[in-house]
Design a protein with these regions (language model features):
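Short hydrophobic alpha-helices and adjacent helix-cap/hinge residues
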Residues: 1-324
Length: 324
């Protein structure tokens, strides 16, 4: 065999593994949210940043399949089953509820799952413990029930004369929030009225009841459905001239009075970081469930003026951002 033929054959043999690598399919990630694509846009950007920190870029070396329920909790289980059927390498589930079918699917999935939930995942049986989740599940736990005491305290500081506080709550959520709120309001000497709402019409009805209940303020709890209706809820609070506190800054940006909650963007970045680690071989059950460490108070001075409210100096001093 002539030397040129030998060199050609060797060169071709050397190129085969490179060609094989180039033809390998991109890893696939499933993303399921209880909100809408529009509502999740900023959080998804943070999620992609976290993936990027691990070396994964959507469209380049990673594919992502998205599913959104647009605030309709009843669709979560069906859409998760659909994603599981697509057999991605990892699935992100945002807005985990206490719905038994959804929890059972997540616990028994052979595909690693990274969640974002406001409920205690140990109490709901989703993980064995926060430090050692076990199984095939891990994620971010915001434990919103623990923020309720702070939020109610802020309302009390804003309106010292308040006697009755209303609480807007989605009954599809865990019962931890109203139970925690009842304990806190009892200690503060306040009456708590829980208003259930999980549809547009129920939101309108809930706010219409505020005058009848003589509520001095309202606490709007966390809910993917509520977040998709942030503008509507902020407008209702303005219409009925009731001071409101929210968990997320998006409500304040939509015209709400004030919010106190965790830094959602940092949490979603960490979801991306965890997803990248799992794609590289880490087991979900070995990764501890993370909790937020960054919190922020955002106030809307324009809304306060419209309501005839003046933020006390103490609240102004600790606010992370004031929207004018």
């Amino acid at each position: 065999m002539r030397r040129r033929e030998v060199v050609t054959l060797l060169g071709g043999a050397t190129a085969w593994p490179f060609a094989a690598r180039a033809q390998q399919p991109k890893p696939n990630v499933g993303y399921l949210s209880g909100r809408s694509a529009e509502t999740d846009a900023a959080m998804l950007a943070a999620f992609r940043r976290g993936l990027g920190e691990g070396g994964y870029v959507e469209g380049r070396n990673l594919a992502i399949e998205y599913r959104f329920t647009d605030g309709r909790y009843e669709r979560m289980a069906a859409l998760l089953a659909e994603l599981i059927g697509r057999k991605p390498e990892v699935i992100i589930v945002v807005g985990v509820t206490a719905e038994p079918t959804l929890l059972r699917q997540m616990k028994t999935s052979q595909i690693p799952i990274v969640f974002v939930t406001g409920a205690d995942p140990v109490r709901t049986g989703l993980v064995a413990s926060l430090n050692r989740p076990g199984g095939n599940v891990t994620g971010i736990c915001t434990l919103v029930s623990e923020m309720i005491a702070k939020e109610l305290g802020l309302l009390r500081e804003l309106i010292p004369s308040a006697k009755t506080i209303a609480m807007l709550w989605n009954p599809h959520n865990s019962s931890e929030e109203p139970n925690e709120a009842r304990e806190v309001t009892a200690k503060l000497g306040l009456q708590l009225n829980v208003l259930n709402a999980s549809t547009d019409s129920e939101l309108n009805d809930a706010f219409a009841m505020l005058d009848h209940q003589r509520a001095n303020a309202i606490l709007v709890t966390t809910s993917p459905f509520y977040l998709t209706k942030a503008k509507q809820i902020a407008a209702l609070a303005a219409q009925y001239r009731v001071p409101a506190i929210y968990v997320r800054r998006e409500y304040v940006e939509a015209g709400g009075l004030m919010s106190y909650g965790y830094d959602i963007f940092d949490s979603y970045r960490l979801v991306g970081v965890y997803s990248a680690r799992i794609l590289k071989g880490d087991k979900a059950g070995d990764l501890p469930v993370l909790q937020p460490t960054k919190f922020e108070l955002v106030i809307n001075l324009k809304t306060a003026k419209t309501l005839g409210i003046t933020f006390p100096p103490g609240l102004l001093a600790i606010a992370d951002e004031a929207i004018e």
